[in-house]
Structure formats: C-alpha cells, structure tokens
UniProtKB/Swiss-Prot annotation:
Keywords, alphabetical: Ubl conjugation pathway
Signal peptide: none
Gene Ontology MF: a single term: DNA binding
Encoding gene (name): FBXO21
Domain F-box: residue ranges: 28-84
Protein name: F-box only protein 21
Organism lineage string: Eukaryota, Metazoa, Chordata, Craniata, Vertebrata
Organism domain of life: Eukaryota
Amino acid sequence: MAAAAVDSAMEVVPALAEEAAPEVAGLSCLVNLPGEVLEYILCCGSLTAADIGRVSSTCRRLRELCQSSGKVWKEQFRVRWPSLMKHYSPTDYVNWLEEYKVRQKAGLEARKIVASFSKRFFSEHVPCNGFSDIENLEGPEIFFEDELVCILNMEGRKALTWKYYAKKILYYLRQQKILNNLKAFLQQPDDYESYLEGAVYIDQYCNPLSDISLKDIQAQIDSIVELVCKTLRGINSRHPSLAFKAGESSMIMEIELQSQVLDAMNYVLYDQLKFKGNRMDYYNALNLYMHQVLIRRTGIPISMSLLYLTIARQLGVPLEPVNFPSHFLLRWCQGAEGATLDIFDYIYIDAFGKGKQLTVKECEYLIGQHVTAALYGVVNVKKVLQRMVGNLLSLGKREGIDQSYQLLRDSLDLYLAMYPDQVQLLLLQARLYFHLGIWPEKSFCLVLKVLDILQHIQTLDPGQHGAVGYLVQHTLEHIERKKEEVGVEVKLRSDEKHRDVCYSIGLIMKHKRYGYNCVIYGWDPTCMMGHEWIRNMNVHSLPHGHHQPFYNVLVEDGSCRYAAQENLEYNVEPQEISHPDVGRYFSEFTGTHYIPNAELEIRYPEDLEFVYETVQNIYSAKKENIDE
C-alpha cells in the first residue's frame, strides 16, 4: 500500500506543480520560509513517503525541494532502511526516490515469497529449487536480504513461521554468494597468500547470519598490531616495523629485529590480552571461526597460527604455515638469504602454546612421534583451508543432536568446492541428502541433484558401483513414493479412536523421567514406529507399552523425540523452547503455549480449542493460588 501511495503521489507531480500555490490555505506562508528551514521540516521524521509525495505535488518550489536525488528522499530512505546506507558512498549520485520504490517493491516481493513457503514446504525440507523464486527476482540482492533481516527482527515471540523461512532463505542467499567468492579466491595464483581472507570465507559460510566481514576482522587485528607496536617501541624505539603504514607488506631481514617483534607479540597476545589455546573445549567449531577466536581469545593450533602469522607479517616477520600432523605450526627461517636450507634452519613456533619456539626434535616430542622432513614444509593457502575445513568436517560427523547436520552439510559444501572430485565425500553428501530427505520439489530436479552426484562418483571411481547402485535404487524408490503420496492426514480429537489422547499440539511439556522441556507438534493414538525402534527404545517395559498415545516433541536441546503419553506431564513453568524448527510448526509463543501455524492447524483442527481449555485450567488456577 505504501508503494502504491508513493507511485500515485509522484504520478501527479508534473501536472499539479504548474498550478498556483496560493490557492492552498497557509501554503504561501510555508513556501516563503528559507529553503534550509523547509528542508529541515520535510526531513523531521514525522512525514511518511506518501506525505512527501503529496507535498511535492502542491507547488513548484516544494517539488524542487523534494527532488528525487535530494536530501528529503534520502532521509526517507535512511529512516525506513538505515542498515542499507552503508552500501552508498557520499560521493555517489543516487536517485533516492527510485531507490525507495525499488526497495519497497523488493520488500513486498520477498514477503510474498516467505509467506508461500510454509504451505509449499511444510512436510519436507526446502528443496534445492525452492529458492529459485528469490534468485529470479529483479532488483539488488541486498534489498531482498535487508527485508529478510527486517522479518527476523520482528517482535520476538510472533511471526515465528515467517522468521523460520526468512532465516532459511537468507542463509541460502548468503551462502551462495560466499561460496562464489571463495571459488574466485581459490583461482588466485599460488603466490597470493591471504590466509586470513580464506579463513574469513570459511567463517562466513558456516555463520551466514552473523555480521562477519574481512574488513571488521582486519580492523580488530590492526588494533592488536597497534598494541604490539606500543610494546615494541619500549624494546627498540627505532625499530623499522614502527614506520610501517597500514597495508604495507615490507619484510625485515635481520633476525634480531624479527625476534624483537615476536617477543612483543608474545607479550601482547598471551600476557596482556590473555589469548590461549583452548585445551578445555578443543573440539568446538567456534575454535575455527576467526571472529570467534578474536572475541573469545582462544582457538586451536591452526586458527591461533593464522592470527599469529597475520600479525607477524604485518610487522615484517616472514613466518610461514607448516601443516604439521596433529598440531599446526609456523616456521621462522634462521638461515642466510639465498642459502640452501633444510628443516634444521628453521625455528618452529607453536601459537597454540603461547608462541613457544621449538626445534625439530621438540616438534616431534610435541606430537609424540617421528615424522619425515616433508611434513616440515610450507603449505599454500588452499592446503591451509583444506585442513581447516577438514577439522570442521570431522566435527560435523560427530554432531547430529539437532538432526539437521548443518555443520556437516556446510563443511561438505566447502570441501567439495575446493576438491570437487573427492569420491568418498561425494558419497557422504548423497547419503546425507537421502537421510535428511532434502528432496527437490520435482523428480527431474532430484535427478539433477542426487543422481547427478552419484553419476559423477561412478565416473570418478567405477569401484564404487555397489554403493552408487544402492543409493540410486533408493532415490528412484523415493520418487515413486512421492508420486503415490496422498493428501494431508487430518486428526480430529473428537474421533473415537483418539479418545485416549490427553495432550495437544502447542502445549509445553516436561518429560517425567529425563526432565527435558519440550513442545508437542504432533501425536498418534498409538506408537507408529517400527518393531525395531520399539525394541531398541524398550517401549515394552512401559506400563502401557506401545498401546498408548505417542507425541512428536521438539526438545530444548535441539532434538526431536517421540515420547509416550505416560512419560509426559504439563510444565507448570512454561518457557520458550529454543529449537530451530519451532517456526516450522508454530506462529507465536504466548507465554504459556505455542499457537500452531495454518499448516499445522489444518492437520489438527480441533487441538487449539483443547489447548485454550488446558491453559485456562492449569495456568489460571496456578496464578489464583499464587495470588491467594
């Protein structure tokens, strides 16, 4: 509506601007004010875009003040979408009225698509072609992203379904952009050694919703460099590194001067700023994200080494990365320039161990084994990133509690972007798609996504015929099942076969045995799992066995579980359930329960009334007891 009002107002500007202004009551007094005062009034923040459109149609002078490239429309744009202003240079010529219209249109289109996702993808993960509507929209991508961010920032407990799908779309858009940037980065010549830039791309890809930029991370590192320079000045006030300007890449050749830099670095990083290797929580993905390393001041050998190397190089010390087994190191050359060097001409630096300087023998003691000379060699950017992503991949294989395997999916994407012909990882990716049910909307797209991966594997390694054949068979079976699927199953509480169901979707529950908090998002009159699951979960040991209602619940730890009715009870102190899929099923949290979204309510049309009765009986009674 706002966009229509703006368009409507601006369409009449040329015709009305030629008419005499004094006919309008009080207008003559207004237009006689100095231009700066009028501009200040029009930019006061109380006027909407539609107001400005109407004002500019009253007379020529006000129209000129509201010119499309002027301050008035710039202020309208800034007030409405402040986060976008960083994308404009003060020296750029911008038609702010046109920008306003394009941004408004992009927002309306983005909301239309977000609103459609729940109905289209409620029963499955968003497929590979599910984002094509966004990709095909006309207009700057930053406008669509900004609208998605606006949706995510809506009032905390409402619009949960919109936020759920807006988050997925934003996640996808940013990851696609970051992956393209990473691929372009990997095409740089071998002598392009921006290790930090590559590490930031990995960080961004795994955390696409976070505000992470190379510029911001570099600024934080620059502030550390300033502290090192301050300490270095106390060691040697004439040190050449102190004269370096930002962005310079000069190197100092004297070993003694390099040593002074490293001493100052060790003091600032480990004594003053308290950076340290994270021995207590080593297997945490946060240790590999550079923005988290700077925030938490801890990491693992490879991330600590990249930070150390970046600072050292900015101060003129040419350290090099060493892909040492089990413990990433840096090496510092002690030999003369131009001489033939071997591994004993280097000192090896353990950034994880507070910058400790090691000999070759001490490096072997560090990992408890003898290694060949080749493992002391320097590695390029791609190999460093391969090791970082390999670490994330290992962590991703361990994690699965939220059943989305997001870290595993992200690290697989990154690894295959660098090494697209890794057969075992391609097989793992195909299995992951199959396991998660991330099926495309149409069978032809599924063939392009899953079967294409399998065909590529077969070409690379014919020996994988058995594994590929198994996955192809199951993929084709899935296509056939999708063709045979019937409509939505509706469960009515009033149905006689559901008479034993005591709880309803949206209620906050507590598990009697394990104590976890959860919200119900589905139920069955009896256990619908297979015999193997029933046996493994020891369901027969329950007093009512599998002949009782079972509930699908989202648990606060991020897992999804299937709980027997006798194991659940009302949570007398209901709280929000921080599960990533809450928005998939619910539109709002009221403080006592969740309200199902339209798609879930279609499947359980009588549950909401029962929820209201339960809330009234359980929580209102509790409040009355407290008041008494």
